[in-house]
Amino acid sequence: MKIGVMGAGSWGTTLAKVFSDAGCDVTLWARREEVAREINTEHTNSTYLRGIALPHTLTATTQPTQALCDADVVVLAVPSQTLRGNLAEWCADIPQDALLLSLAKGIEKETFLRMSEVIAEVTGAQPDKVAVLSGPNLAREIAEEQPAATVIACTNEKNAQRIQHALAAPYFRPYTNTDVIGCEIGGACKNVIALACGMASGRGLGENTLATLMTRGLAEISRLGVAMGADPRTLSGLAGLGDLVATCSSPLSRNRTFGARLGEGKTLDEARAATNGQVAEGVISSQSIARLADSLGVDMPITRAVFGVCHRDQNVADMVAALMGRTKKSE
């Protein structure tokens, strides 16, 4: 199977490696010439995956048309808030019969659309040809070939199975699901809860606090998912609970690390500077998810608290006090 991976960051490069290790013909699109050259000549991507040896069968290009040409599966590995613009540039070259696989985890800021909805809207692809990947998938660990599992969600189960077979490597086990909504909501919302866990950790708070945030965070993610039509069982699986635990617990998680810097007292700009100018996905998603929840009448207090810190200049201590001072109720 021919795979075109659009985006050579840590996650895109890792998935390109997995597809290659599973026996696929993979072309990886990189925005920067030096990244593509290094992948082709040194078989490494030191900018995003330092120390990881890439398969010699994996080729890179800076030409989108070359990566997309005759692809059976197009993997979209760009940030959620840039997906629409990138797709507008690429859609004319995406093969009509290709399956589209989204790696982005977020809700579009202005439209409140999920990533699969953005893909279908911009490309004109039928929803049953758009799939999403979600699970406890920290890129570095998978690139190191540590055993992991993931979920491929598509409303067409046969199309999900096609991607599942193409992506199955000795160290990477994909499951399938037809609940695209649940997988996308779990993937988008966990970044916000991970920010909250990072903030708590940055303030020196302990495991009880983190466990409380994760558990109650899962409860509010489930409320939103169900309100949008998700199967609640999805959110207790790999794409919900699994992804949440990994992202909230690991120092490899960009969202958790960014939150920890905010918890230590850094401003948003200072935290961004400490991460080479990158803003964690959860910072952007907290705004769109909080507003989406409001529009649906869904109570998401942790998400709203993170939104307050990131977009309303509230401090972390006040966030904790507000959460602990909420009206008492049953679980």
UniProtKB/Swiss-Prot annotation:
It holds the Pfam family NAD_Gly3P_dh_N. Sn-glycerol 3-phosphate binds at residues 105, 135, 190, 243, 253-255. NADPH binds at residues 10-11, 31-32, 105, 139, 254, 279, 281. Signal peptide: none annotated. The active site is at 190 (proton acceptor). InterPro entries: 6-PGluconate_DH-like_C_sf, 6PGD_dom2, G3P_DH_NAD-dep, G3P_DH_NAD-dep_C, G3P_DH_NAD-dep_N, NAD(P)-bd_dom_sf. The keyword Nucleotide-binding applies. It is an enzyme of class 1 (oxidoreductase). One of its GO terms (cellular component) is cytosol. Pathway: Membrane lipid metabolism; glycerophospholipid metabolism. Its EC number is 1.1.1.94. It catalyses: sn-glycerol 3-phosphate + NAD(+) = dihydroxyacetone phosphate + NADH + H(+); sn-glycerol 3-phosphate + NADP(+) = dihydroxyacetone phosphate + NADPH + H(+). Coiled coil: none annotated. Keywords: Cytoplasm, Lipid biosynthesis, Lipid metabolism, NAD, NADP, Nucleotide-binding, Oxidoreductase, Phospholipid biosynthesis, Phospholipid metabolism. It is found in: Cytoplasm. GO terms for biological process: carbohydrate metabolic process; glycerol-3-phosphate biosynthetic process; glycerol-3-phosphate catabolic process; glycerophospholipid metabolic process; phospholipid biosynthetic process. One of its GO terms (molecular function) is NAD binding. Its main location: cytoplasm. Belongs to the NAD-dependent glycerol-3-phosphate dehydrogenase family. Catalyzes the reduction of the glycolytic intermediate dihydroxyacetone phosphate (DHAP) to sn-glycerol 3-phosphate (G3P), the key precursor for phospholipid synthesis. This is Glycerol-3-phosphate dehydrogenase [NAD(P)+]. It comes from Corynebacterium diphtheriae (strain ATCC 700971 / NCTC 13129 / Biotype gravis). The gene is gpsA.
